[in-house]
Design a protein with these regions (language model features):
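Structural alpha/beta surface segment adjacent to cysteine/selenocysteine redox centers
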Residues: 57, 62-152, 184, 213-220
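A short beta-strand-turn-helix
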Residues: 42-59
Length: 221
């Protein structure tokens, strides 16, 4: 089965002889969705969305994820395999920020790091780093030094990265994605939508592939 769950500081870093402030985000909690929430009333989320794959792909997987969420980390290699097997012409992947800081204390600063990388055009590289190395940084008392290392490995402008992490622009994107998720009825992570349809927690990988194959056969319907 897909790994679903359903649930209701300051760091100064010396770079090149200077001190940069990696700001921590304010903690927020998800507002429970209204009973009549539905895709028909869904909010748009952050624009542009973090997306890869053809805009004309017959299958769109939209993930609402939390980088510190263990089931999200478990879903990550499954999604990478789907990407490899189907390719960008058939599968488009969209990631939406849905940090749950009340249970994952580093979730917001991880989302900030991803958004800061995105401002330099490298969101997906940071996404890969955060999920593939989740078991390491998520256990650290303060993981921001790990995020700086990831940014350096990716080749980001470090001064800009630390300035953007936790900035109002990054926080706005995170909040817009969370609001979209709430409007769709998302209450936990990962929540996965295929062509606008939320998958139930008991969905198996085979069922997901069957659904994707059917959508491809029917031209995305």
């Amino acid at each position: 089965m897909l790994p679903f769950i359903i649930i209701g500081g300051v760091l100064v870093i010396a770079i090149g002889g200077g001190a940069l402030l990696f700001r921590a985000s304010k903690q927020t909690t998800a507002t429970p969705p209204k009973a009549n929430s539905s895709p028909a009333t869904a909010l748009a989320g952050a624009k542009p969305a973090h997306a890869k794959g053809s805009e004309n792909a017959p299958v769109v997987i939209e993930e609402f994820g939390d980088f510190q969420c263990p089931p999200c980390g478990a879903f990550y290699p499954q999604l990478k395999k789907l990407e490899a097997d189907y390719g960008p012409d058939k599968l488009r992947v969209v990631f939406r920020e849905f940090p749950l800081p009340t249970i994952h204390k580093h979730a917001l600063i991880a989302a900030d790091a991803a958004e800061a990388a995105g401002f330099q055009g490298h969101f997906w590289e940071m996404y890969d780093k955060l999920y593939s190395d989740q078991a390491t940084w998520s256990k650290a008392p303060d993981p921001r030094t790990f995020f700086i290392d990831y940014a350096r490995d990716i080749g980001l402008d470090l001064q800009r990265f630390v300035q953007d992490a936790g900035s109002p622009e990054a926080d706005s994107r995170i909040m817009l994605d969370r609001q979209r998720g709430i409007s769709l009825g998302v209450v936990g992570t990962p929540s996965i939508f295929v062509n606008g349809r939320m998958l139930p927690p008991e969905t198996s990988e085979k069922q997901l592939r069957d659904m994707m194959d059917e959508a491809i056969k029917n031209g995305g319907k």
